[in-house]
Swiss-Prot record:
SMART domains xref list: Ribosomal_L40e, UBQ
InterPro entries: Ribosomal_eL40_dom, Ribosomal_eL40_sf, Ribosomal_zn-bd, Ubiquitin-like_dom, Ubiquitin-like_domsf, Ubiquitin_CS, Ubiquitin_dom, Ubiquitin_ubiquitin-like
Cross-link Glycyl lysine isopeptide (Lys-Gly) (interchain with G-Cter in ubiquitin), where in sequence: K48
MF terms (GO), sorted A to Z: structural constituent of ribosome
Keyword Nucleus part of the UniProt annotation: yes
One Gene Ontology biological process: translation
Organism: Tetrahymena thermophila (strain SB210)
Domain of life of the organism encoding this protein: Eukaryota
Lineage: Eukaryota, Sar, Alveolata, Ciliophora, Intramacronucleata
Protein keywords: Cytoplasm, Isopeptide bond, Nucleus, Ribonucleoprotein, Ribosomal protein, Ubl conjugation
Anything else known: Ubiquitin is generally synthesized as a polyubiquitin precursor. Some ubiquitin genes contain a single copy of ubiquitin fused to a ribosomal protein.
Family: In the N-terminal section; belongs to the ubiquitin family. In the C-terminal section; belongs to the eukaryotic ribosomal protein eL40 family.
Name the UniProt record assigns to this protein: Ubiquitin-ribosomal protein eL40 fusion protein
Record-annotated Ubiquitin-like domain positions: 1-76
CDD domains in the cross-refs: Ubl_ubiquitin
Amino acid sequence: MQIFVKTLTGKTITLDVEASDTIENVKAKIQDKEGIPPDQQRLIFAGKQLEDGRTLSDYNIQKESTLHLVLRLRGGGMEPTIAALAKKYNCEKKVCRDCYARLPPKATNCRKRKCGHSNSLRLKKKPKE
């Protein structure tokens, strides 16, 4: 049977499949046609995201049905070394007790005029982990 896969760009892909094909197989066919890796594909039918292990018949997908292809969002956490560097840079500072200005770790007086360049400084508190 023939089904259609519509991408977010509006392009429609035609696939020849069987009702017994798994969603993984459909994603592999999309990869063959479009070059999009299956791990980045999300298929939506009738408002539901299709799971890899299930078949087309499980979702009542019949001939000439249209699936919607959405790509997985990239990104995530920072590399541990970058996270440690950011933590060090943001936490090892001094704070003026009068105007709460953030100052470099070796500062002895505040740089702001509104507190009269106070020498009342404290270390910035460490965030809770």
